[in-house]
């Protein structure tokens, strides 16, 4: 029988009255302000088109206009704040055993704790540190949970997990009820949920690293102790319990599970992450480092694969309203058991994937995340997180074909012409195939099994094919971005492989741009191209990168052009 979560409705009412509890508790410690100004624009000077309408630089160009500032409700977070890296949100980590070692006892705010090989100061000591914070309550581990829980609920632990830890079954109604009592005492009764310094909380506090995977669920099923019906019955109310408990602060809850988990229930568990989000929580993934794998079809983020292989994000739904946390973690490139020979490539692609999913928060560790090595790129990421089509300074498309190996063996629920190949990563700018402008796969920049085998093969860049009559690339600008660009200056940044003869220009309804002449350097270069006035606006959203031949006119005499990345930028 379900153990009822006590006093949930009453708590919601109390939260609405300001977070007071039935019994007075000592005020929470208030740390000093962190000495860091987050309202900082680009740290690198913007590369404009210059007086001739075209400026070309070597390599990638991540620069943004000086006016750009971070989006509200967005940022970088980590275990420790780093003012130099503009990481201003630190963690407060606790174990369940630490804060409630005795059944029915008040929250112990002085006791220390440990989990995952980490040692934690007491709650009050951590609250007394400067700056905003995010939180994890490590709850499920047999060594994280209070000893009395397993005895009171008469449950066994499962495991070990891949980190050697055994876990209690939090889906057990008795265990879950006790955990909800602790969440209520910790976050509602103390007023911690309403603390403006608290940015968000990872929930539910299970399993390895408090990340909700299905390794332990599968172990319980294989042991004969759990079936689909029982699990889904618990799951159906679990997230409502948390949302109701947090009340008006429920937007701070972040579910740590994933779409299409590697679970034991087949199709029955495919969409459970979306169910948690639909209950009124944010969501987080921890594996955008594997930028090609398992996150193309992501219902919790409202990202879906189209029949032509492009990815579309439905931003009309609450998860992308700006009120919720949509987070990822990008720090495992030459860490966490991963390895790459090209860390810049790995960092770049993982961040493009995160932004394609419209993330507003990103966990980083400055060293392993290579922030010092690639400062301009990370600055662009910081200023892109949480932006919308209306507020973003740029819209972009990364031209590529990459296989999502998860769907190499799974049956996809809809039409997908070239399964498992995904075309491009796009954010308010879509590359469109049409007669005379069909983009072709190229092998000039191919990566295989970057970080690990699951990441598959990726062909970076797409090519024209003069022999097939395809002499350009058509771009469709999101109508919201275009409308917000009305009356503003715009440039197009095109990262291209500087090989072959000929030039290219940008064709718009307002006229053509100046030409970019290839020099045959054999390197990736980025051209910043001034667009004619009115090229992008409420009634103008189509652009075409067009080849020019040796004579400057006849495209058929040009060599093929490979393009890897395109950005439309509002300069005003």
Tell me what each language-model feature is:
Residues 17-19:
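C-terminal motif of bacterial Sec signal peptides marking the signal peptidase cleavage site
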């Amino acid at each position: 029988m379900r153990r009822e979560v006590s006093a949930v409705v009453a708590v919601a009412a109390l939260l609405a009255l300001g977070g007071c509890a039935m019994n007075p508790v000592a005020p929470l410690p208030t740390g000093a302000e962190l000495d860091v100004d987050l309202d900082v624009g680009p740290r690198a000077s913007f590369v404009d088109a210059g007086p001739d309408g075209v400026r070309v630089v070597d390599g990638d160009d991540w620069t943004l206009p000086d006016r750009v500032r971070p989006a509200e409700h967005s940022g970088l977070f980590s275990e420790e704040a780093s003012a130099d890296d503009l990481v201003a949100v630190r963690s407060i980590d606790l174990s369940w055993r630490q804060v409630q070692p005795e059944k029915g006892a008040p929250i112990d705010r002085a006791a220390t704790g440990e989990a995952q090989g980490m040692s934690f100061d007491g709650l009050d000591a951590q609250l007394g540190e400067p700056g905003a914070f995010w939180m994890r309550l490590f709850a499920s581990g047999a060594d994280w949970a209070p000893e009395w829980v397993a005895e009171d609920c008469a449950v066994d632990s499962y495991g070990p997990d891949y980190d050697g830890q055994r876990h209690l079954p939090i889906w057990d109604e008795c265990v879950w009820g006790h955990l909800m009592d602790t969440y209520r005492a910790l976050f509602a009764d103390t007023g911690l949920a309403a603390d403006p310094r608290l940015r968000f909380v990872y929930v539910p506090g299970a399993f390895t690293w408090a990340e909700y995977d299905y390794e332990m669920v599968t172990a319980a099923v294989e042991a004969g102790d759990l079936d689909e019906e029982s699990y889904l019955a618990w799951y159906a109310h679990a997230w409502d319990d948390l949302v109701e408990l947090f009340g008006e602060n429920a937007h701070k809850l972040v579910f740590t599970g994933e779409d299409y988990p590697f679970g034991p229930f087949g199709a029955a568990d495919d969409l459970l992450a979306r169910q948690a989000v639909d209950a009124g929580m944010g969501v987080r993934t921890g594996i955008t480092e594997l930028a090609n794998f398992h996150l193309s079809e992501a219902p919790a983020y409202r990202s879906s694969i189209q029949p032509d292989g492009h990815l579309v994000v439905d931003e009309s739904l609450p998860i992308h309203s700006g009120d919720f946390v949509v987070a990822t973690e990008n720090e495992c490139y030459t860490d966490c058991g991963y390895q790459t020979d090209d860390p810049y490539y790995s960092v770049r692609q993982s961040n493009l994937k995160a932004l394609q999913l419209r993330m507003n928060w990103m966990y980083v560790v400055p060293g392993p995340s290579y922030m010092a090595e690639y400062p301009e790129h990370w600055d662009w990421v910081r200023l892109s997180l949480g932006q919308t089509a209306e507020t973003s300074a740029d819209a972009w498309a990364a031209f590529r074909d990459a296989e999502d190996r998860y769907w190499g063996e799974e049956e996809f629920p809809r039409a997908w012409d070239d399964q498992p190949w995904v075309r491009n990563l796009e954010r308010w700018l879509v590359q469109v195939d049409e007669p005379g402008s069909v983009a072709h796969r190229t092998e000039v920049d191919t990566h295989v099994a970057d970080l690990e085998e699951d990441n598959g093969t990726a062909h970076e860049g797409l090519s024209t094919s003069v022999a097939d009559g395809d002499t350009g690339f058509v771009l469709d600008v999101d109508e919201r971005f275009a409308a917000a660009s009305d009356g503003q200056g715009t440039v197009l940044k095109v990262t291209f492989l500087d090989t072959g003869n000929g030039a290219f220009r940008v064709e718009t309804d307002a006229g053509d741009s100046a030409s970019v002449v290839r020099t045959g350097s054999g390197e990736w270069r980025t051209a910043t191209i001034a667009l004619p006035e009115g090229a992008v606006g409420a009634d103008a959203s189509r652009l075409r990168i067009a080849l020019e031949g040796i004579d400057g006119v006849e495209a058929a005499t040009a060599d093929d052009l490979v393009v890897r990345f395109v950005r439309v930028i509002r300069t005003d």
